[in-house]
Amino acid sequence: MDFGEKFQFIKAKIHVIIRYSYRRDEMAKRRKLGRGVAIVGAGMSKFGMFPDKDTKDVFAEAFNEMLASVDKGVDPKEIEALYLGNFSNDFFVHQSHWGPIISDLIGHTPKPATRTEGACASSALALREGVFAIASGFYDMVLVGGLEEMSKRTTEEVAEGLALATVPYEGRVGFTFPGVFGAVATAYFAKYGANREHLMNVTIKSHNNAPLNPKAQFKLSIRDLMNAKAKSLEKKGIPVPEWQDEKDFLRDLKANPVVAWPMHLYDCCPISDGASCMLLVGEDIAKNFTDEPIYVAGIGQGSGRGLHSWDDMTYFEATRYAAEEAYGMSGLKPEDIQFSEVHDCFSIAELIHIEDLGFFKPGEGYKAVEEGQTRLDGPMPINTSGGLKCKGHPVGATGVSQLYEVWTQLKGKAGERQVPKKDLRIGAAHNLGGTGGTCTFTILERR
């Protein structure tokens, strides 16, 4: 290839890049909902490990709360379709086909019931499908939600089940979920100069929020856990380490063992059972059910590549794409978002996602957390619910449970964990499936 041919080749490539970038920007702006969609009711079960309950029990808990939350009342028979997220109950409890099972439970049959699967983002995908079904005008009212029952399996079995959400060969070579996010953390440390102390800041912040959430799986702060551990050791006649503060406790390898360096026990989310659901209606009929609907301002979805093709492990391509779509649809910018739930399956994930979503610049997320910017009383509260880390992570229920928190905050019903901002109008939820294979970002608005 001579110089002239090389020049023409490079010129053509530049034109393709410019055209593609322009098309992406324009398409994001054009992707508006043809009909506004509102959330008029929401419910969520308590998250945790429930040996005496099954999947239907916890979904009934969420569904009944949803019905009670509709200010002007609703007849379940008005629900025209069900979209239900579930990742792997076929593995965890040997039962698949959850759409019609839940449809029968709530008296919805013979109307349509569809199961969606996107690993940890399964129920967020259910909500996305429900939004589009309403926006198209095909339905006026749909129920969306998710569920998962994980506690009947051992930790090893749960790890095996969760590995189904990775590219087939990744788990076989040691890239379990903790392994992947351990590698992500080391890459982030190397690129930006962060360290394990900064991960501890995320953990401590989330554990401070969780005791304020009555539905959270873990309701103890790190200081509470430290004191409880000290009492337990003392009762057993074992010398108590001289922990000076929460970070001292988290540095102790006996109290906080390594899972996949630099991920330690308290950097990881738990095994959980739980369910969540929301009632969606067309914007034009929303006031028939409540005087204060919460509207879906924007929703985006992205997908990611297998780890072998990542050229940089310090960001998630799918998150950035989903955010671009949601911002384009809503006409909003990152600085318009007043608080957000993000997918903190591991502490490092929260740091990276708050950068990918545009809340902080790349490499600045860990500094923002250290400065207290993401605390409940900070300028950009993150994971007011306690996050996956403390609220719990019943995989198929997580996406809608994050939006339940955003809805609760925007309705002013979050109690002690209510974001202390005078005019709280816009919140968001970010949900990641697998090791970045599926991502959704949803923006809710109170008008």
List each language-model region with its residue ranges:
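Short, Lys/Arg-enriched N-terminal segments with co-localized hydrophobic residues
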Residues: 9-26
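Condensing-enzyme catalytic core mediating Claisen C-C bond formation in acyl metabolism
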Residues: 28-56, 163, 167, 171, ...
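Conserved catalytic cysteine-centered active-site region
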Residues: 33, 89-145, 149-180, 240-270, ...
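Phosphate/pyrophosphate-binding loops at sites that engage ATP/ADP/AMP, CoA/4′-phosphopantetheine
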Residues: 64-80, 188-193, 288, 322-336, ...
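Beta-strand segments within the central parallel beta-sheet cores of soluble alpha/beta enzyme folds
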Residues: 76-86, 112-118, 142-147, 197-204, ...
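Short glycine/threonine-rich loop-to-helix capping motif typified by GTGT followed
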Residues: 89-97, 308-312, 344-367, 394-396, ...
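Active-site-proximal alpha-helical scaffold in enzymes
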Residues: 117-148, 178-218, 278-284, 394-414
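Polyampholytic, low-complexity intrinsically disordered segments
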Residues: 204, 210-281
